[in-house]
Regions:
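HTH-adjacent hinge/linker in prokaryotic transcriptional regulators
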Residues: 1-61, 91-96, 100-101, 108-116, ...
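Residue-level recognition of beta-strand microenvironments
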Residues: 44-46, 71, 149
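A short beta-strand signature within small-molecule sensing/ligand-binding domains used
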Residues: 64-67
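C-terminal regulatory/effector modules of DNA-binding transcriptional regulators
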Residues: 58-61, 74-77, 89-90, 96-97, ...
Length: 181
């Protein structure tokens, strides 16, 4: 019998969905979802990692980093607040202007950094004062939070990011495969 055992399992990716199994920039995701992206830097600082930051991020005490707070808009709505920490030795000469365009584009295409892998944890957390200040949360009192440790081809963790998403715009899509034991 022709075609026996073949099923089409493709489902189109939902609007405003982000992928789990790949590293995709905010701009790339917006483009894939046919939405207009904008990023605004609301805080930018150069810091030296202390004990508190090391415990939170995994960077070494004494590392020089950039710390940014970036607000991501989709179709004019503020939906994601990112707390980004970048190792200065990798993200050399990072500026607000670059951060409002695409940090990954700058790293890959200007600095030649090969971004290889990201370890992510997804949680739901109570909103903070800064979430409430910058994101129109309506009746929501919590945020979907994606925490990432991202590594380059030398195995160096160059980025720690906490990405805080409005719950009504949070959708991550993945395809899972069962492995035999």
């Amino acid at each position: 019998m022709q075609g026996k055992g073949v099923r089409i399992i493709f489902q189109p990716v939902l609007q405003t969905s982000f992928t789990i199994g790949s590293i995709e920039t905010f701009t790339e995701s917006a483009k894939r979802n046919n939405q207009k992206a904008k990023t605004k830097v609301i805080y930018f600082a150069e810091l030296v990692v202390d004990k508190r930051i090391a415990a939170k991020t995994g960077f070494n005490i004494g590392d020089e980093i950039y710390y940014l707070q970036r607000l991501h808009y989709l179709d004019g709505k503020a939906i994601i607040l990112n707390h980004n920490y970048f190792l200065k030795s990798v993200a050399k000469d990072l500026t607000i202007e670059i951060a409002e365009k695409s940090i990954y584009d700058y790293l890959e295409n200007t600095l030649g950094v090969s971004i290889v892998t990201s370890k992510r944890i997804m949680t739901v957390e109570k909103m903070t004062e800064i979430d409430e200040k910058y994101l129109d949360l309506g009746d929501y009192n919590c945020m979907a939070v994606v925490t990432s440790h991202t590594y380059n081809s030398d195995g160096v963790m160059f980025e720690y990011t906490q990405s805080r998403h409005r719950p009504d715009y949070f959708s991550f899509q993945d395809n899972a495969t069962r492995r035999s034991i």
